[in-house]
Amino acid sequence: MIQPQSYLKVTDNSGARKLMCIRILGTNNCKYANTGDTIIAVVKESVPNMPVKKSEIVRAVIVRTRKEMKRDNGIIIRFDDNAAVVINREGNLKGTRVHGPVDRELWKKNFTKIVSLAPEAF
């Protein structure tokens, strides 16, 4: 569960390293975001000479959360960190690679390119 002011690790090669959530997109009164939700975030750390710069406002999709999530078949899944992937307004990735595992629920939310680029999907 990600809320405003939460820090997230970036798992693609767009140039950003850390994000801070500003707003959760979707509904008017949404307080928390889970895997597959789109957020608006500010870049807190970045790599020099890359497309995404520090203090830039970007959109991101959450791919991993520390909060455990129960699936319909009874399996509980939890990751070690909160992580996101930077996207543009159309929903396309800004980077070309995704590092680390991602949640399988991204298929259901039509982020199939993120799942196909990731090395593992749990």
From Swiss-Prot:
NCBIfam families: rplN_bact. Keywords: Chloroplast, Plastid, Ribonucleoprotein, Ribosomal protein, RNA-binding, rRNA-binding. The gene is rpl14. The keyword RNA-binding applies. One of its GO terms (biological process) is translation. The lineage of its organism: Eukaryota, Viridiplantae, Streptophyta, Embryophyta, Tracheophyta. Belongs to the universal ribosomal protein uL14 family. HAMAP family: Ribosomal_uL14. It is found in: Plastid, Chloroplast. This is Large ribosomal subunit protein uL14c. GO terms for cellular component: chloroplast; cytosolic large ribosomal subunit. It comes from the Eukaryota.
